[in-house]
């Protein structure tokens, strides 16, 4: 008690209980108690409940209100910055645990060349989106204005405790490449303008009305606020000027994603995507059966899918695909074979995948078929069985599962996949199964390092042998991996294996050093390498994707020609490191050290295989980092002469 009183006096400031904001008082109390003993979420709930009872507040203070009070005290210089308190109060910390925060924006309603029978077609929404979806609702409320959408989302993230200086911008809505060319360019320019000017905004909150909906269980928050200086905000005159400014902006776009259909993955569009600094494509694949695609009016073929993904690889893009189990004409065998096919066909093998189990919603042809008893919707048992089998038997360690279900409110779903927490339920059931069956768990873990070779760091690494179409060759520099101990992940994908909150801070002086793991597999362009730093159980800290193109599969653009290897992604799964100049933590040093180690290994493999250049499809602000590693900007790629 004496120690607590000491810290309370240390952090407290004189106040009049009749006039002081009670949330300020509560923040000071939380800081004081955390100084004595680190608080967890349960402790925080107890403190808030006791405080509300003592102060006779009408309800328990929400974390959003406390975060606002914290920032007010910080702004008034009455407290010092406290990372632990910010993390404790942060809403949905997982949104920034992968190292970035995602901002989704939607384009305006516009016709789509497809006539998919499962797609909703609301009059005032882009094709396939429903106005009650959280992201779509935010776009509709902001009249699909890209600047307003970004401002709104960044403000929401900031007020819920997330740093927004590293942003993955995701452009959704209809078939973007079918829109007029000027609109596509202006939309992207506006995204850069919004990020460049967000820090200049002057925001006024009416007292006592922080949010329209202040429930802590709500996914999205709409803030009542007024932007008082919008008329004085100056935007860039050109796209290139906006991109250049973003290199040093406080809120930087580190990745830009757009959606497309297979028939739009042309050389012309690939070049345009790079000029907009697009780094990732999401492609609607849906099925690997031509009869299923035709029955659902997709109006493209499996061969077009294969050719499109081949083209994306040639240009060095990172890509995601969408798969829809349960489409009209489905069987379990066809749905399962689709997953087997995409990870055995060298033309597919996606970096990322989204499961979108088919749902029956109104305003669709599929709904009419369902009403006529011509379509039998998926059951939850069917979906869980398929997910379970693909997790345990198919999904490889180099891919990432981004979603298991689409974010459509259950109230909008007439039949089919309508459990919004399907991912959580499936993961929990699989965890119980693996805990009770060690042999099955060991079988899953063994697929992490199938037929691996263990070498030491002194051995010259030369990887020249080709792989079979569905084979993964693994080389480990470090210690023998642990294939026995139970771990929390139930799938081998990179998202399941992120280090997240399980890690302890690490530096080069620690006894235990992560292994350097090199997984090689075959693609249609030629040889792919997934190079990562992992602990002995397979949890990922850092990774990169290296592509060695066949000499006959190269394109002549920006030094992407013969004898040029490609880095398609360099990613760090560590708590977001802020880009502020005054932050000088061990975390930042780790990022630079391990990033350079991954680059060094990619360069070594490239040189050993007689490649003369290494080209990186880099984010805008990362150019400075690559320049320090002796890379130069050539066209829209960073290139190093080996």
Per-region residue spans from a language model:
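A conserved beta-strand-loop-helix scaffold within acyl/acetyltransferase catalytic domains
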Residues: 518-575
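Conserved active-site alpha-helix within GNAT-family acetyltransferase domains
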Residues: 618-637
């Amino acid at each position: 008690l004496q120690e607590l009183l000491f810290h309370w006096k240390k952090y407290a400031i004189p106040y009049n209980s009749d006039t002081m904001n009670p949330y300020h008082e509560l923040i000071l109390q939380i800081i004081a108690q955390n100084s004595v003993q680190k608080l967890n979420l349960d402790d925080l709930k107890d403190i808030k409940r006791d405080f509300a009872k003592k102060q006779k507040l009408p309800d328990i203070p929400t974390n959003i209100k406390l975060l606002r009070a914290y920032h007010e005290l910080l702004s008034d210089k009455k407290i010092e910055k406290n990372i632990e308190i910010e993390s404790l109060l942060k809403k949905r910390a997982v949104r920034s645990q992968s190292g970035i925060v995602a901002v989704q924006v939607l384009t305006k309603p516009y016709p789509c060349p497809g006539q998919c029978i499962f797609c909703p077609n609301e009059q005032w929404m882009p094709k396939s989106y429903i106005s009650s979806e959280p992201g779509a609702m935010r776009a509709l409320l902001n009249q699909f204005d890209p600047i307003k959408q970004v401002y709104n989302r960044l403000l929401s993230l900031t007020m819920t405790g997330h740093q927004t200086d590293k942003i993955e911008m995701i452009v959704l809505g209809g078939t973007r490449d079918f829109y007029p060319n000027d609109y596509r360019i202006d939309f992207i320019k506006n995204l850069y303008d919004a990020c460049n000017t967000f820090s200049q905004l002057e925001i006024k909150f009416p007292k006592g009305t922080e949010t329209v909906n202040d429930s802590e269980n709500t996914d999205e928050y709409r803030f009542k606020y007024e932007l008082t200086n919008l008329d004085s905000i100056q935007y860039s005159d050109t796209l290139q000027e906006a991109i250049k400014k973003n290199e040093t902006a406080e809120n930087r776009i580190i990745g830009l994603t757009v959606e497309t259909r297979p028939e739009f993955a042309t050389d012309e569009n690939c070049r345009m995507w790079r000029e907009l600094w697009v780094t990732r494509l999401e492609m609607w694949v849906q099925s690997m059966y031509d009869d299923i695609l035709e029955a659902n009016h997709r109006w493209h073929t499996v061969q077009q899918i294969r050719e499109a993904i081949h083209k994306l690889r040639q240009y060095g893009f990172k890509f995601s695909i969408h798969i829809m189990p349960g489409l009209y004409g489905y069987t379990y065998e066809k749905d399962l074979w689709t997953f087997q096919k995409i990870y055995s066909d060298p033309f597919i093998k996606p970096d990322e995948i989204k499961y979108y189990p088919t749902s029956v919603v109104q305003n669709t042809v599929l709904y009419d078929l369902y009403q006529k008893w011509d379509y039998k919707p998926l059951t939850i048992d069917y979906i869980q069985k398929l997910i379970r089998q693909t997790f345990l038997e198919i999904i490889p360690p180099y891919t990432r599962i981004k979603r298991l279900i689409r974010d459509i409110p259950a109230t909008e779903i007439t039949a089919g996949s309508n459990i919004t927490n399907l991912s959580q339920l499936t993961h929990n059931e699989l965890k119980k199964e693996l805990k009770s069956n060690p042999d099955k768990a060991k079988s899953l873990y063994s697929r992490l390092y199938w037929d691996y070779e263990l070498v030491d760091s002194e051995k010259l690494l030369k990887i020249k042998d080709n792989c079979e179409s569905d084979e993964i060759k693994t080389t480990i520099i470090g210690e023998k991996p642990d294939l026995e101990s139970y771990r929390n992940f139930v799938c081998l994908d990179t998202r399941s294996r992120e280090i997240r909150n399980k890690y302890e801070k690490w530096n080069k002086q620690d006894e235990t050093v992560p292994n350097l793991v090199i997984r090689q597999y075959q693609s249609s362009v030629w040889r792919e390498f997934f190079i990562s730093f992992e602990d002995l159980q397979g949890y990922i800290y850092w990774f990169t994707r290296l592509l060695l193109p066949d000499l006959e599969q190269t394109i002549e653009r920006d030094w992407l020609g013969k004898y040029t290897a490609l880095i398609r992604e360099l990613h760090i799964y560590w708590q977001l490191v802020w880009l502020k100049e005054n932050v000088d933590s061990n975390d930042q040093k780790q990022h630079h050290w391990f990033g350079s180690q991954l680059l060094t290994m990619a360069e070594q493999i490239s040189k050993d295989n007689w490649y003369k250049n290494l080209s990186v499809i880099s984010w805008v602000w990362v150019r400075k980092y690559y320049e320090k590693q002796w890379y130069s900007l050539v066209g829209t790629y960073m290139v190093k002469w080996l």
